[in-house]
């Protein structure tokens, strides 16, 4: 759009860089900025180089001299266990504490990974689950999250029943952020339940 980049440090979280990008419309279901969490409290191992092709380059290849860019990113096996421990955290959230907005994305992300080869790769790296748990206990301690119970035999992915209505509303409000074939809330949660059972059997 010919506008300068608007980059700044988040005042509430000094380890996060904010990129406020030009937009043609707003949507209450999504953040209107990109958050780059690049501080010391972000775990980067294991990591790998991945080629990313923007959607714009796929749709208008004639406009791009370079369609792909290599990005160093955390391996999907670690992301799988990061997401699983987020769900464990939410399963143990006290009833008087509200679940943050847009948290249904974590259930959707884990649903997608459970349907991909990432699941088996993550299952083969249970050491990463322990590393994620240790990291969160050290840097994000919350007694009620019960991180020591986030081991294969006792990890919890499903939220309490009283959270489901709110979670479903959140998921419905986020539909504009999702691409392709979008699973129903029921299908997504059934897959998460099956995944929890699979992990318990490891």
Question: PLM features: residue spans?
Answer:
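Structured mid-to-C-terminal alpha-helical surface segments
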Residues: 1-202
């Amino acid at each position: 759009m010919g506008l300068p980049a608007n980059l700044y440090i988040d005042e509430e979280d000094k380890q996060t860089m904010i990129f406020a990008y030009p937009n043609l419309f707003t949507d209450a279901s999504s953040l209107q900025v990109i958050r780059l969490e690049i501080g010391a409290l972000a775990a980067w191992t294991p990591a790998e180089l991945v080629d990313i092709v923007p959607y714009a380059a796929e749709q208008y290849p004639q406009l791009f001299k370079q369609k792909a860019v290599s990005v160093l990113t955390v391996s999907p096996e670690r992301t799988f266990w990061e997401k699983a421990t987020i769900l464990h955290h939410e399963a143990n959230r006290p009833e008087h504490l509200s679940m943050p907005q847009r948290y249904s994305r974590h259930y959707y992300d884990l649903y997608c990974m459970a349907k991909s080869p990432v699941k088996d790769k993550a299952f083969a790296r249970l050491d990463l689950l322990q590393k994620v748990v240790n990291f969160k206990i050290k840097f994000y301690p919350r007694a009620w999250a019960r991180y020591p119970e986030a081991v294969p035999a006792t990890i919890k992915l499903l939220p309490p029943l009283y959270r489901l209505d709110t979670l479903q509303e959140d998921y419905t409000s986020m539909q504009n952020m999702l691409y392709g074939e979008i699973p129903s809330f029921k299908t997504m949660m059934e897959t998460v339940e099956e995944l929890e059972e699979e992990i318990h059997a490891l």
